[in-house]
Amino acid sequence: MRVEVGQIVNTHGIKGEIKVKSNSDFTDVRFQPGQVLTVVHNNNDLEYTVKSHRVHKGLHMLTFEGINNINDIEHLKGSSIYQERDHEDIVLEENEYYYSDIIGCTVFDDQETPIGRVINIFETGANDVWVIKGSKEYLIPYIADVVKEVDVENKKIIITPMEGLLD
């Protein structure tokens, strides 16, 4: 199974570099030189090997092997990028999850009252923050004091909200 790891938002320069908005975790591994990515363009799967990777202004700047000119890559703007989910270089620790497993889960408080659904995840220096869309939009820190149970099979998360977290 493959997961979407980003989207090509634009090109950069004339030597075939692309700007990628990542919607994935483990970008330090996924975008390493030598990694194979699949770009889906007009319902066609195009495989590319990463030649270089750097981060600039919050975007991932990639070049692919064999692409040395803007004309070879410009037509891919707006295309989604995928990689195999069970990437051999990624080892999940206990209580560590793929973003794709968490996004879409329904979040409940410890009284089983539904709060909303996870729609996005932000990385911060200390911990990830989950964006929950319910009657309002909530920002929930992924810390042990708040997140009590994650059941990815049933797409269910139980939290114990800190005071003021859901106000």
UniProtKB/Swiss-Prot annotation:
GO terms for cellular component: cytoplasm; ribosome. GO terms for biological process: ribosomal small subunit biogenesis; rRNA processing. Gene3D superfamilies: PRC-barrel domain, RimM. It is found in: Cytoplasm. Pfam families: PRC_RimM, RimM. SUPFAM superfamilies: PRC-barrel domain, Translation proteins. Keywords: Chaperone, Cytoplasm, Ribosome biogenesis, rRNA processing. Residues 94-165 form the PRC barrel domain. GO terms for molecular function: ribosome binding. The keyword Chloroplast does not apply. The PRC barrel domain binds ribosomal protein uS19. Belongs to the RimM family. HAMAP family: Ribosome_mat_RimM. An accessory protein needed during the final step in the assembly of 30S ribosomal subunit, possibly for assembly of the head region. Essential for efficient processing of 16S rRNA. May be needed both before and after RbfA during the maturation of 16S rRNA. It has affinity for free ribosomal 30S subunits but not for 70S ribosomes. Binds ribosomal protein uS19. This is Ribosome maturation factor RimM. The lineage of its organism: Bacteria, Bacillati, Bacillota, Bacilli, Bacillales. The gene is rimM.
